Amino acid sequence: GSNYTLVGMIPGDSSYQQGNSNIPTEVGGLYVYIGLNGSVAAASGAATAGTATATFAVGDILGWAFDAENGTLQCYKNGVSQGTQFTNIRTDIGWVFCVTDYDNSATATYVINFGQRAFAYTAPSNYKALCTAALSDPTIADGSTAFDTKVWSGNSTYPRSITGLNFSPDLIWLKNRTSAYDHVLMDAIRGTGTTKWLSSNLTSAEGVNYANANVTSLDANGFTIGSTAGTDILNQSGTATVGWAWDGGTSNTTIAAGSLNSSVYNQSAVWSGMCSPAPSSGTYVQGFDGNLTSVFASGISAGSYFTFTPTGGLTFSNSVRVYMGNVSGASYQYNGGTTGSLPINSWTTVATGGGTMTSLGVTRNVLDVHGWFAIEVDGKLLVDSDVTPPNVPSIPSTVRANPSAGFSIVKWTGTGSAATVAHGIAAPKFIITKSLANATNWVTGHDSIGWGNFLFLDTTDAQGASAAVWNNTAPDSNVFSVASSSYINPAGSDVIAYCFSPVEQYSSFGSYLGNGSADGPFVFTGFRPRFVMTKASSASGLWNLHDTERSNSNPASKLLWADSSSQEVDYAGGDFTIDCLSNGFKARASTSSLNSSGVTYIYIAFASHPFKTARAR
């Protein structure tokens, strides 16, 4: 029959189904009509169609070179370029390769090589095969070297050593699976023993329930459980227990107030002396004092610029950013050319990739022109050399950090007022905190809900909003912020924090939107999960704890909950279940605590293997 073969791409979330006579453009995609005349077409808004290709016959080899970053597509026939078939391809969505016979009238076999074997023709320069072998090598090749899960059966024999970890654990989180006993958390900063454990399902202060659990040591490849005066909730005969463990580095470090100033500020000059014209309200020093709430203003006409002209130019290797506070209608001009708006209360990147800044001007479209609140070059605020900026961090802390695994343990004494605390890793996306001496809630922060909001780990509550918790400030690569809340920063009392930053192909912290179906949303993590914790953030819901040690095949159905002492429940394909896949996880139930339609859920996940080496299970 006639050859009506179409080769194309469709959006990753498309409803396209082979055999239903749909062509890619009907579902927001694009195609090349290789079987008939080589014509090209794209759905409205999907791409701009360009050069047609030659016609392909049986035995011809089509090359498909898609540049997802720049939104271009070039085809090759038997190794010869056919020009550029598409430009301006949407870069804000995922794309899936597809091939179809337009009218389903022909019987055809398509052999597609995504890199599983050698190509017949050399791929264009800077293009990679669409297969996991082409992925970059992961920082952590084996997730069990930084995080792992262990299970054991109690035997009421002491001391009981739990071994088999590939690291010395610095945080352990333990839960009896058989009985409704409390969770137990211990770490290398606070130490071990009956008076040192905390429970994620209780507001109790440290060690209040000391008689029921006793971890006597954190060892080279595990930990040791000791005897107790009360009911042993960790090694009782006839019960099963699970333990999750993280590697937090090798030693505790005291980080003094102000000890990170040189990492945060560039004080190599009096920058305020390199600006013009003079403002009538305030001085240029307010743009170079390290304070993001002060600003200079007025004295120039609307549309005129306050301009910073660094002597000899200021070279940079990464980026230049400007902070604009609570002032609307401001804009910038960089090096006398590039212009752009400056949204209120936010940083705006004005240059990237390296270069020399010779001038930076800020203006406003009204007479009351305001200047910049701060300028940052290569991650450091420009601060006058004769100014004393705020200390970073503002208070001291004890930190045990494993930057390569994106995990740290932090302990500090609360101040009862706004403060910054050092954490020792890349900017955390998830933080768990607990006041040690007070019966208060566990407070968590998650990047997906914003740092003006919080969740309690020990309750099912939806997210709450309060500037008194994280001071409406996202963590950066040096510190996280706390405010006046007695939950997180009680004056004179110690607080512990567990901080997590994402490491590509090892850990992921994000969110997904529920669809209310057993065919739930897929969440890409970039690895096969070993551990997944989920929680409804926009509505009430449980903190679900999954791992592939307890559920070693899909669906992962054996559930515990961080906010509950309940024993493990095996839902065997029903409520709460997920599939753990080679590159993420997928909700397989519509229960309200996992996948209600229209509800937003946060997740925290750690890898068994990176996507590059993960295989189907």
Where does each model-flagged region fall?
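Extracellular ligand-binding interfaces
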Residues: 323-342
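A short beta-strand element within beta-rich, extracytoplasmic domains
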Residues: 1, 174, 291, 299-327, ...
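Disordered, acidic Ser/Thr/Pro-rich linker "stalks" and the adjacent N-terminal cap
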Residues: 18-22, 258-311, 334
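Extracellular beta-strand-rich recognition modules
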Residues: 320-324, 358-365, 587
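Short acidic/polar inter-strand loop motif in beta-rich domains
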Residues: 367-370
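Surface-exposed molecular-recognition determinants
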Residues: 2-3, 9-268, 272, 291, ...
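Extracellular carbohydrate recognition and processing domains
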Residues: 338-354
